[in-house]
Amino acid sequence: MDIKTKYDIGYTYWVPRVYKQFVRTEILRHEGEEWTRDVSEIVAFAKQKVIRCVEVRVHMDGTYHVTYGVENITDAGTSMFQWYPEENIPESNTEEVAQAFAEGYMRDNPDKEYFGN
């Protein structure tokens, strides 16, 4: 059986993200008492991912299912390995497309987080 996968190992793509991020700690004072509070805001950005491996499961009836092992690309290298089915990987998401989607989602849903895939 000849099985062709849609994406190769090393394929990179971008996904939109919108979530709460703690941006600063405020020091509050009242009548001699002091305490801190973490302040968060919703941020929108694009995250790059890379395919590291491919898993193909062939069933007894001759059908098959393809999943991809994917890692996030960060400034520190790669992290957070996850498995995704083929249909959950976007074909041509550029950083600009993912960023625009994230910003649009944040504008339309100001209190909701979105993690793409």
What are the roles of these predicted feature ranges?
Residues 1-12, 19-22:
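Mixed-charge, Lys/Arg-rich low-complexity intrinsically disordered regions
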Residues 7, 13-14, 64, 68:
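Aromatic side chains
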Residues 15-26, 71-72:
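Short regulatory "switch" loops immediately downstream of catalytic or recognition motifs
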Residues 44-47, 52-117:
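Intrinsically disordered, low-complexity, charged/polar segments
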